[in-house]
UniProtKB/Swiss-Prot annotation:
Cofactor info, note text: Binds 1 Fe(2+) ion per subunit.
Xref: NCBIfam families: gcp_kae1, T6A_TsaD_YgjD
Cofactor: Fe(2+)
Subcellular location: Cytoplasm
Xref: InterPro entries: ATPase_NBD, Gcp-like_dom, KAE1/TsaD, Peptidase_M22_CS, TsaD
Catalyzed reactions per annotation: L-threonylcarbamoyladenylate + adenosine(37) in tRNA = N(6)-L-threonylcarbamoyladenosine(37) in tRNA + AMP + H(+)
Protein name: tRNA N6-adenosine threonylcarbamoyltransferase
GO biological process: tRNA threonylcarbamoyladenosine modification
Taxon lineage: Bacteria, Bacillati, Actinomycetota, Actinomycetes, Frankiales
Functional description taken from the UniProt entry: Required for the formation of a threonylcarbamoyl group on adenosine at position 37 (t(6)A37) in tRNAs that read codons beginning with adenine. Is involved in the transfer of the threonylcarbamoyl moiety of threonylcarbamoyl-AMP (TC-AMP) to the N6 group of A37, together with TsaE and TsaB. TsaD likely plays a direct catalytic role in this reaction.
Family the entry assigns: Belongs to the KAE1 / TsaD family.
Domain of life: Bacteria
Residue sites binding substrate per the record: I139, V140, S141, G142, G143, D174, G187, D191, N281
Amino acid sequence: MPPEQGPVVLGIETSCDETGVGLVRNGTLLGEALSTSMDQHARYGGVVPEIAARAHVQALVPCVRAALSSAGLFVADIGAVAVTAGPGLATALHVGVAAAKAYATALDVPLYGVHHLAGHLAADLVDGEPLPDPLIALIVSGGHTSLLRVGDLARDPITHLGDTLDDAAGECFDKVARVLGLPYPGGPAVDRAAVGHDATALAFPRPLTGRADAPYTFSFSGLKTAVARWVESHPDSPVPAGDVIASFQEAVVDVLTAKAVRACLDHGIGDLLIVGGVAANSRLRALAASRCEQTGIRLRIPARRRCTDNGVMIAALGDLLVRAGAEPSPAELTAMPGAFLERAQLGTALPALHAA
C-alpha cells in the first residue's frame, strides 16, 4: 500500500447495545459490520448492561472478521485502531476498549480512544463532504441532547451552547412510548405510529421556549409527565391514540428544531448538523429541513442507517484524527462511562497549541 493512502483504521463501537465495526482509509469506507442485541433487551423495556456486554463479547470478533472480508482485507492490513472509550454503559465500553487495545498491541499500531458523541458528529463523513468549520450541531439520542458549536472536529475544543437538564429526547420517546403501550425501542415506534395522524390534536407543552428561558437548554421530563397525566385522565377520550402520539412527537421536534435554528441565527453560523439516534425520526428531519430552508441555513443529517450507533462513525473519526496528526492514546486507555464531550479524542492531554 502506498504510504500516501494512509493507514486502514479499524473502528470499534460498543457503548450500548450495538456492536459496530468499520474500516476507513483516507475518508473512504472500505468495510463494515453491525450486530445488535436489541431483541434481547425488548422484554425488559430497556437495555440491560450485563446482557449487552455478553453480546459484545460474542459478536465483536465475528464483526471484525466480517468487515475485513467485505473489504477484501486481512487483519494484518489494519494500520490504526479507534474505539469508543465513553460515554456509555461501563461493562459494554470495557469490552470494546479491551478488544481495541488487544488489536493495537498485537498489530503494533496506534490506538485512538474517541468520544462516542464526537463519533456521531463524524457519522456521514464517508458518505458526504468534509464538515463545515464552524457549524452548529444538535445531538439527539437516547442519552444525550445537546446544542454545540463545532470547529475543526479533530483539533478544536467543542463548545456546549446548551444541554438537557433532565431527560434526553430519546429517553423521553422511550418513556412516553411505554405509557402509550408502544413496543421497545420507543423512538421508531412513535415515528411509525404518528404517521398519518393529527399532530395538532393536542397542545402539549413546549418546555423552555419562553422569552425568559435559556435559549439553548432543553428539558423533557415535564412533557413526559404531561402526556402521562393526559392519558391517565382521559381513559375514554375520543381522541385517537395516533393523534396523541403525533401531538407528543410534534412537541419534541418543534422544540429541538426551533432551538437549533435559533442557535445558528444567533451565532451567525449557516450550517446545522443534526446527529444521533433521534435524527432518524422522519418528522424531525422534515421540520428541520423546512425551517432551515425558510432561514437560509444549510442542513446536514446523516442517512438513517448512520444515525444509530455504528462502527463506521468511529472509524471515520479515527481516520480524521490520524490525518490531522493527532497523538495516539496511551496504552493505559480505559473506559470512561461518564465522559463529557469537550474534544473528539479521549485519554490524551490537551495539544500544545491549546496550552497556556
